[in-house]
């Protein structure tokens, strides 16, 4: 109940509050996040660091709430997709190191003002970072060097390592805090030979980088599936992504579901046999049917191409 004199315009506040009430909600269980975090932590050596991926609004689970919880449970690093995500976390009081996986050249101000640590994957980006730190009078700003060992997205080539070392030794603006790569098929035994090729390439390239720079560089290549299946290669740090949210590549038992999508039924209709339902008449009922309409669609991430699919769980 909202009460007060008319000149306070409480009816406007009431309208705003009503707009905040949705019949479709995604519940996120932070206790499950902590449980999954500890499940993966138990597979690691005590000294192995962990990066947790909270990019893309925490895969829809709420980046700040996740980041705060992970910070409280001594996560070593967080990783976001773009600098703006990291800046928002800083505004909310997140203080642990944050890696920006896809830094844009236009985001340097945001990076430096919020002490966000960029992934550096090309000489163009490396040179731009060096110039910007020199212009600002900054020294030893942490960056994270990415090596492409077979994923073929972003990254330097392994043969670029000598030139990277030469560039880094010739300046004082940035320092390589870590070197890493990304496994392409660690979630399937079908690609194990390729995964081992990637691991071998990275081990060699990372060793060359560290030797050429003559200082300790954090090394990491394992993602969630890699932690489950290739823990022997945990090196100095691992990156926990989809596993944090309860999805296991190898069917690992013990992970807990993090998210629950809840909604209400708007209407129930009787549809005669032979009639179609929905866009493009993709679904036809073979018998007289009773259907329920729920308020979930594009805005909730449910694409129309998922039409005519059966969703089944023990709770359905």
Please identify what each model-predicted range represents.
Residues 25-27, 32-34, 48-218, 234:
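Active-site-proximal beta-alpha core segment in soluble small-molecule metabolic enzymes
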Residues 1-35, 83:
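ATP-dependent carboxylate-amine ligase
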Residues 5-9, 148-151, 224, 243:
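Short glycine-rich anion-binding loops that position phosphate/pyrophosphate groups of nucleotides
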Residues 37-48:
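Glycine-rich phosphate/diphosphate-binding loops that line cofactor/substrate pockets in enzymes
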Residues 312-315:
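Conserved small/polar residues in nucleotide/adenosyl-binding loops
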């Amino acid at each position: 109940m909202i009460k007060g004199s008319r000149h306070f315009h409480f009816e406007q506040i009431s309208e705003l509050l009503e707009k905040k009430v949705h019949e479709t909600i995604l519940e996120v269980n932070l206790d499950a996040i902590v449980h999954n975090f500890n499940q993966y932590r138990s597979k690691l050596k005590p000294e192995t660091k962990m990066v947790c991926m909270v990019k893309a609004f925490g895969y829809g689970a709420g980046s700040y709430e996740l980041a705060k919880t992970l910070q409280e449970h001594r996560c070593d690093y967080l990783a976001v997709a773009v600098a703006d995500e990291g800046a928002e976390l800083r505004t909310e009081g997140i203080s642990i190191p944050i890696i920006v996986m896809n830094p844009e050249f236009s985001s340097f101000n945001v990076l430096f003002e919020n002490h966000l640590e960029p992934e550096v994957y090309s000489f163009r980006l490396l040179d731009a970072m060096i110039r910007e730190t020199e212009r600002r009078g900054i020294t030893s700003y942490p960056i994270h060097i990415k090596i492409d060992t077979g994923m073929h997205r972003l990254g330097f080539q392994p043969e670029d390592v000598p030139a990277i070392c030469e560039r880094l030794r010739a300046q004082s603006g940035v320092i390589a805090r870590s070197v890493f790569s990304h496994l392409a098929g660690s979630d399937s035994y079908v690609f194990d030979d390729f995964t081992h090729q990637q691991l071998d390439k990275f081990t060699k390239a990372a060793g060359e980088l560290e030797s050429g720079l003559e200082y300790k560089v954090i090394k990491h290549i394992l993602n969630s599936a890699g932690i489950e299946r290739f823990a022997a290669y945990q090196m100095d740090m691992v990156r926990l992504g989809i596993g944090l949210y309860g999805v296991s590549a190898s069917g690992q038992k013990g992970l807990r579901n993090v998210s629950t999508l809840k909604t209400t039924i708007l209407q129930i209709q009787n549809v005669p046999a032979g009639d179609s339902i929905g866009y493009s008449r993709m679904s036809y009922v073979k018998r007289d049917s009773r259907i329920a309409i729920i308020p979930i669609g594009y805005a909730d991430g449910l694409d129309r191409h998922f039409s005519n699919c059966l969703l089944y769980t023990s709770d359905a």
